[in-house]
Amino acid sequence: MSNLTVNVIEEKNLGDNKPCVLKFSQGLPPLSFIEKEPEFISMSTKNKRHRVVLTNTDQLEYESEDKDSKYAKYAIGIFDKNTKQLKIVPTKIQTMNQSVIGYTLTLDSSSVISREERYDKIKKLADSFGSKITKKKMQKMEMENVENLDYEKTTKSIDAVKNELADIESNEKPFDLPDFDAETNDVRKIYNIEAILPPRIFFGLNHQPFLDIISKTSEAPSYLPEYFKDQLKRFEDIKDEEKVVYNCKLLTFMWYSMILMKSKGGHEPLIKEGCTSEVINFLVSIFGSKINHKKYNISQDDKLKIYNYLAIFALKLEDFQITDIKSLAQSLSLTSSSFEKHFTRVGCKVVRIGSEKRSVRLEAPLKLPKARFSN
C-alpha cells in the first residue's frame, strides 16, 4: 500500500444517499428476516430511518435514534484495490430500537393505557436513560428468544383486552359492522381500515396481480367484474406509488371477500387467487364459521355483513363519495336499489337518480339506522 492515496468526501457532497451505520443493541435480526429482503425506508419529513422486516409469522419494526455526539464524528473507509485509493465517507451511527408492529391497533377505542403500551414506554425510557443493569433486565425479558420476541404472548394479551372490551360493548356494538367512531366529524376517521385489517393480514394480501394489470404486464382475467377493472383503470392516474399499492390491497380484500361469499364453503377458489391460508382463516373468522380446516359456512347474516364491509371499503377507495354504485352492485349480482340499503346501513346519505342510479356519501357524525336490512 505504498502508493495509497486518501480522498476525504465532504458531507455536503453526499446528496440524499448518505451512508448510515445501524447499531442493533437488542441483537441482530434473525437471518430468516434478512433473507426476506427487508425494506429500508428513508423518512424525508423526519430525521430518522425506519427498517421494517416482515414475514408471514413475525412482524418486527426497528426505529432508529441518532446517537451522534457533537464531540465525535464517524466515517466509513472504502478502499478501491484497482486505484489504491481510500475514500473516507462521513456517516452517522443509528441505534435501532426494536418493537412489535401493530400491537396497539385493537386498543384504539380504549382511553386506558394498555399493558403493552405501558411496557413499550418503559422499554424506550430504559433504552434511553436506564442504567446497564436496567437495560440488561429489559433485554432479558424481551430478547430471550429474538426470533419470537414474545409476539405470541403479546397477541394473547391483546386478544384478552379485546374480549373484555367486546363484553362491555356487546349490547351497543352492531355485529354486522366493524368498529366505528360515532362522535368524530371527520368521515375519514369513522371506520378505521387499519384496525379492520391487522398488519399481518394487510401485508399478507397478494395485491401483485392487480399491480401487474395496472402496469400492463398482464391482462385482467375475463371473469374479473367490471367494477374491479374500472378501479384499476382509475388507479393508473395516481402518481403516488404507495397510494396505488395501498388501494390495490384494499381492492384485493374486497375481491377475496366476494370469492369467500360465492365459493360454497371451500378454500380452493381463494387459493387459486393467491390468498394465503392465514388470510383465509381471518376472512372466515369475521365473515363465517369454520366447519373444518378446509370447509366453512357463510350464513345469510354473514352475507349481509360482507355487503356492509364492501360498501365501507368502496367508500374508502373513492374518498367516501361514490357517484354511481351500479358497477359494484352488479359485481355482486345485485341491483342498485337493493345494494343501496347497505350504504344506508353504514351511515351514508343516498341520492336516487332515476330507477337505477344511486349516488352515496358517508356523513359525519355517524348516524346509523335503527334496524338492519335483508336482501
From Swiss-Prot:
InterPro entries named in the record: RNA_pol-assoc_fac_A49-like
Q: Which organism is it from?
A: Dictyostelium discoideum (Social amoeba)
Give one Pfam family, short name only. Answer: RNA_pol_I_A49
Q: What does this protein do?
A: DNA-dependent RNA polymerase catalyzes the transcription of DNA into RNA using the four ribonucleoside triphosphates as substrates.
Where found? Nucleus, Nucleolus
Q: Which family does it belong to?
A: Belongs to the eukaryotic RPA49/POLR1E RNA polymerase subunit family.
What gene is it encoded by? polr1e
> Which keywords belong to this entry?
DNA-directed RNA polymerase, Nucleus, Transcription
Instruction: Please give the Gene Ontology molecular function terms for this protein.
Output: DNA binding; DNA-directed RNA polymerase activity
Q: Which domain of life is it from?
A: Eukaryota
Q: Which GO terms describe its cellular component?
A: RNA polymerase I complex
Q: What is this protein called?
A: DNA-directed RNA polymerase I subunit rpa49
**What GO biological process, any one, is recorded here?**
RNA polymerase I preinitiation complex assembly
Q: How does it assemble?
A: Component of the RNA polymerase I (Pol I) complex consisting of at least 13 subunits.
